[in-house]
Amino acid sequence: MKNIAIIGASGYTGAQLTALIHAEAELTIQGLYVSENSLDKGKPLADLYPSYSHIALTLSPLSDDAKAKIVAEADAVVLATEHSVSLHLAAWFYSQGLAVFDLSGAYRFSDVAQYPKWYGFEHEYPEVLAKAVYGLAEWNAKEIAATKMIAVPGCYPTASLTALKPLASLLTSAYPVINAVSGVTGAGRKAQLQTSFCEVSLTPYGVLGHRHQPEIATQLGQEVIFTPHLGNFKRGILATITVQLKPGTTTADVAAAYSVYDQAPLVTVKHNHFPKVDDVVLTPNCHLGWKFDENSGYLVVASAIDNLMKGAASQALQCIKIHFNL
């Protein structure tokens, strides 16, 4: 039995992960934590999320005493916190010997030079960063098992990389073009005008400047053009990706490339059949559908995930179970 502390449990991702871990027979929740100045401290989780009324846990402030209690009692800590907050908390808990599963972007790049540009801070813990593993569960299981510092991927990168990584050896130098739409929960729980009921509408954002673009490119080993879109639905991501494959590539070659997922129970791949967001919402699954034109050399692949599940909480749970061999 492994004991897990969840910090940032009042947000959509933290609450979703709480529900997932609560349902696991081999995991227990050491505690749920929010910042000391949070308006949610002291509240039962079910007051914020009535659908979790079966979880009788209260949100505690992350005081120094609380951190000491986590170190004494927990086997691992999950950080569903802001990037700049995770930066320091991850390093501290790692130094105390706990396994850390960070859902922010604070440890996703191995190159410290990336952080000022994409996250607005200098990375102060290069020695911890050097130990961090990118937690793309279907691809990095061996590394996830071997380290105590796991950077859980972003939601768009999870959808995009699951679709693209099998094709890496078949790609030309032409940049893959990724157009992805996410539900409004991807913007977080804080009230914002553009995600309010009366204002939300399908629109691109972060054009040619979203921080998930270099994350995808780094893990793929090739530059990409990535355009995220805000959708007027709650949950889910659909990424439609166009790539050019090397001359002579056949449909059979593509099918063989995607056979890497034949033993991956959470990834479903279909030829000439494309996924819908509703097929994956509230599941840990990724559905891929692809079609290849041998004459032009262009392939279109669509990837559907739940942004709060496979794009965050359920992938964190995958990483936890891989790390502890559960």
Swiss-Prot record:
Lineage of the species this protein comes from: Bacteria, Pseudomonadati, Pseudomonadota, Gammaproteobacteria, Alteromonadales
Keywords from the UniProt entry: Amino-acid biosynthesis, Arginine biosynthesis, Cytoplasm, NADP, Oxidoreductase
Enzyme class label: oxidoreductase
Active site: C155
SMART domains in UniProt: Semialdhyde_dh (SM00859)
Similarity comment text for this entry: Belongs to the NAGSA dehydrogenase family. Type 1 subfamily.
Organism the protein comes from: Shewanella baltica (strain OS185)
Enzyme Commission (EC) number: 1.2.1.38
Annotated compartments: Cytoplasm
InterPro entries reported in the protein's UniProt record: AGPR_AS (IPR023013), AGPR_type-1 (IPR000706), NAD(P)-bd_dom_sf (IPR036291), NAGSA_dehydrogenase (IPR050085), Semialdehyde_DH_NAD-bd (IPR000534)
Any one biological process term the GO annotation gives: L-arginine biosynthetic process
Alphabetized HAMAP family for the sequence: ArgC_type1
PANTHER family the record matches: N-ACETYL-GAMMA-GLUTAMYL-PHOSPHATE REDUCTASE, CHLOROPLASTIC-RELATED, N-ACETYL-GAMMA-GLUTAMYL-PHOSPHATE REDUCTASE, CHLOROPLASTIC-RELATED-RELATED
Reaction(s) the record says it catalyses: N-acetyl-L-glutamate 5-semialdehyde + phosphate + NADP(+) = N-acetyl-L-glutamyl 5-phosphate + NADPH + H(+)
Its biological purpose: Catalyzes the NADPH-dependent reduction of N-acetyl-5-glutamyl phosphate to yield N-acetyl-L-glutamate 5-semialdehyde.
A GO molecular-function annotation: NADP+ binding
Name of the protein this chain belongs to: N-acetyl-gamma-glutamyl-phosphate reductase
Pathway per the UniProt entry: Amino-acid biosynthesis; L-arginine biosynthesis; N(2)-acetyl-L-ornithine from L-glutamate: step 3/4
Assigned GO CC terms: cytoplasm
Pfam family, one: Semialdhyde_dh
